[in-house]
Amino acid sequence: MNLPSDPFEFQRTGKIAKNRIVLAAMTNKQSHEDGTLSNAEIDWLVHRAKGGFGIITTAATHVSKDGQSWDGEFGVFDDLHIGRLNKLTSLVRKEGSLCFAQLFHGGCQSSERLTGSVPISSSINTSKGSKSGYSLEAKEKDIKRIVEDFTKAANRCVAAGFDGVELHGAHGYLISQFLGKKTNTRQDMWGGDLKGRSRFLLEIYRSIKDLVPDSFIVG
């Protein structure tokens, strides 16, 4: 029987976590308006690595400029973010921990006040972040663009030294909105039955896996 203190090997990649204790993604709201990581947020995560966590997971980071949901949320939608992200991963690795980034898009939970854009979702849904109270339904071009944004964001994480990424499919954000029956009422290939509703998530996953190295973890 394995103990929490035992190392864990990711069989498909060969990466080894020094133990089975994982820091979950937790929102800090400490970073800068342009999406770059602040020293305060870096220090918070590194302190947890020093505390012995085998895997450090960042807070949710938006892959598209229009996917931001709250103040102080760091981003990975632009190459300008790579430098600060690399500082984080270097310091975490120095403590012997793996480092994962949690990638997400807020969808109808994005903030029009912060992004300047009306939130988009799988369908027209209520939206506290929208001035009108409702999101727009994502068009085909929006979906393809966001899939590409997730892919580019994952590639930036590779460049920044992350060991992998976690696709945030919970808490009512965009991936979850596509998966849900109540939030996805589309009748095209992106909705309907479970196969259609899961297409968005699977397209993101496949697109990322086609681009990143085999040693990079995607979950």
Show where each model-derived region lies.
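Non-globular sequence segments
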Residues: 98, 104-162
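Alpha-helix-loop-beta-strand connector modules within alpha/beta enzyme cores
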Residues: 73-100, 179-218
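Structural preference for beta-strand elements that scaffold enzyme active sites
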Residues: 20-22, 55, 98-102, 164-166, ...
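Conserved, mostly hydrophobic/aromatic
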Residues: 23, 48, 52, 92, ...
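Aromatic- and acidic-residue-enriched carbohydrate-binding clefts of CAZyme catalytic domains
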Residues: 63-64, 76, 112-138, 177-198
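N-terminal amphipathic alpha-helix/helix-capping segment at the start of soluble metabolic enzymes
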Residues: 1-25, 92
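Catalytic domains of carbohydrate-active enzymes, especially glycoside hydrolases
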Residues: 42-64, 159-164
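Glycine-rich anion/phosphate-binding loops
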Residues: 32-50, 74-94, 111-114, 140-155, ...
